[in-house]
Amino acid sequence: MTASPDPAQRIDALRRRIEDANYRYHVLDEPQMADADYDKLMRELEALERAHPELASADSPTQRVGHLAASRFAEVRHALPMLSLGNAFSEEEVTEFVRRISERLEVKQPLFSAEPKLDGLAISLRYENGEFVQGATRGDGATGEDVSANLRTVKAIPLRLRGEGWPQVLEVRGEVYMPRAAFEAYNAQMRAQGGKVLANPRNGAAGSLRQLDARITAQRPLSFFAYGVGEVSEGALPQTHSAILAQLRAWGFPVSALVEVVQGSDGLLAYYQRIGAARDGLAFDIDGVVYKLDDLAGQREMGFVSRAPRWAIAHKFPAQEQSTTVEAIEIQIGRTGAATPVARLKPVHVAGVIVTNATLHNADQIARLDVRVGDTVIVRRAGDVIPEVAAVVADQRPPGTQAWQMPTQCPVCGSQIVREEGQAVWRCSGELTCPAQRKEAFRHFVSRRAMDVDGLGEKFIEVLVDSGLVKGVADLYLLSVDQLLQLRLISTAESPHAFLREAREHLASGAYAQLETSVVGIGVDLAGERDVPQTWQADLLRAGLPRFDWNRKKIATKWAENLIEAIETSRDTTLERFLFALGIEHVGESTAKALSAWFGDLELIRHLPWPLFKRVPDIGGEVARSLGHFFDQAGNQQAIDDLLQRGVRIGDTHPPSPKLREALSFASVLEDMDIPKVTPVRAQQLAASVDSFAALRTAGADALQQAGVPAPVVAALLQWLDRPENTALANAAQQAMETVLARLPQADALQTGPLDGQTVVITGTLAALTRDAAKQRLEALGAKVAGSVSKKTAFLVAGEEAGSKLDKAQSLGVEIWGEARLLAFLGDHGQQP
């Protein structure tokens, strides 16, 4: 009689056979196992693992089915940023891209790796010692969301690498997508079941991967292609991009079979034509092709510009287009007051999506196209994502149409719509008095990346603003549980009579009588159900609501108490979050982070003249002027004062960056003022002769010319200084420069930090400060704060609920610091919270 196989051996054999089948199906595209046989093996493995739970493993194929839902995704900071790519839309742009590389590297015909640009969701997969440990979305490039549980359900993604020789840490970047045939089959199944269909494969992939319940993701037909690597440690990879892709394929990752190595611009353009011709017949959606310099040494030599590499570019296909009719042109007011014209369209299918609205960008664009109500227009999904009106079919224009004009008044608040000189965008002048701007400002202020007020949704923000209880974002910190309960009852009631019936159950008789008087005051006939104005809710909310003493025993209050607690929690924040939350035009997360790192103090930032902001890398004139305009407004300064007075606390204030010592000078101020003809060279020349704007005026034209400054430059400078507002700005900028320099630590204190050259890792939750704040303070002392533990880690800071990083640090003999030791160390070196 044959002995039964050992369960551990059988489980191991089943896992290997199933993963081999996955590899042959998804990577090699050479399926060698029938679906029925695959299902039979999977069922046997599931049964064995249930019978022997001690043999369970995270990398088992059975773990792809998904787990219970999470409440939200955790943030993941990418060790290396997931950069975006520059775009090319013409052959000339591609030729120019190749020319720049050829000249820089002195190579006539450089080699490129060319590949399709999949229309899916970019992700990063982290492997340690060959095992999948974490997966994250791209997010903003610096920080993504942990979607590891969902990625485990994607069969094309290996849970353990094949072969050998992988680095200890390997981060693989790629695209999760939904194949066209799988998308159509899924939608057909949903229609048959009466379920919700997906709009298009791209949205299907992105939405599936961001499901909080991984069991839902497991039911979606997702796949994956690898296109590169991120962090790599303790291991070597080939020195060309194409060879790296070949190595990834050998380790078990699917790589597009359409990847080719081509030479020069002719090779790139020929590849573009081949892929474009085959586009409609591909098994997946693409919106262009990507060209990457194949040689890694050349990539390092080319480097990066802003948030994109100089050695790679995306060559986009022309957007898909359809014709339809303009039914109306309306104005939308954004949170910064921008008045954007939007075309309301007769519904039309464009690139798999029903489009009913399309942006017209601005009034100048409407004038160029001469778009009119009633016109037949060409609608294009720019980048296959954002619908826009691309052209007017003039010969189909009906008679009697009229040229469109920008309205003179805001459609929301009635304030004047104005346009600054030289600007394309019109804006509502109502600023914070405009409900449209207030609502958008509140949405932005409480968002996750800003003040992170959990539980305050868009609909309730509208109720808050409409009620008049909050007129500025600082009013959030005055709200009470009773006010929230009152607003919820009004906003959800079907009629004022229903609201009063509900209120009677929860109010003392005197308070109820007061409420009844308010309802009658807005014109509601309480004797019957008639004569109820459609706007009764908004009217009552605006009527100045009394504060009622609700009977907490009879009404559900937990949601309101949780919201108040979330508002209270948001009082403690960081400078970069606070700056981002203000909603300053052109100031995104990266700019807010840079401002925080360079200046370190809200009081300093809010009083700086705009030219000094240009000293921060990647902040140009437009962003600097936007910052200056924002802080010049008395209403905005009052809003900041209100927030601080109502308990908002910025916990990571620190001295300005020592880099400002070299960046700031009289010459730099001259350069940044945007004075006509005063180039950086002329600014240095002027600063060598005088040391202040007052001295410039005193010196006069002759003295400046004798110092070698050309007469046209001197004339332009003195003419600029003749305007009082320019003189005031110049003097303020120089005074602010001196203030900043005076606040810098002494030069001899900046030579080295106590942690220079040391790598530190933080894990767990800290009580006294956030991990971001701890990271900034450690970096200020010279440390490099990493995301993973290795033999090179100097010490690990372990907070509450420290996880696997603590275990790994202990196994490697890495020194462990508790929060108390960290705080003492920071205090000893001037970085106390």
Curated annotation (Swiss-Prot):
Cofactor: Mg(2+); Mn(2+)
Pfam assignment, any one: DNA_ligase_OB
Keyword field: DNA damage, DNA repair, DNA replication, Ligase, Magnesium, Manganese, Metal-binding, NAD, Zinc
Gene Ontology terms: cellular component: cytosol
Domain BRCT: 750-833
HAMAP family recorded: DNA_ligase_A
Binding sites annotated in the UniProt record for NAD(+): 35-39, 84-85, 115, 138, 175, 292, 316
Reaction catalyzed: NAD(+) + (deoxyribonucleotide)n-3'-hydroxyl + 5'-phospho-(deoxyribonucleotide)m = (deoxyribonucleotide)n+m + AMP + beta-nicotinamide D-nucleotide
Stated name of the protein: DNA ligase
Record family assignment: Belongs to the NAD-dependent DNA ligase family. LigA subfamily.
SMART domains per record: BRCT, LIGANc
GO biological process, one term: DNA replication
Its job: DNA ligase that catalyzes the formation of phosphodiester linkages between 5'-phosphoryl and 3'-hydroxyl groups in double-stranded DNA using NAD as a coenzyme and as the energy source for the reaction. It is essential for DNA replication and repair of damaged DNA.
Top-level taxonomic group: Bacteria
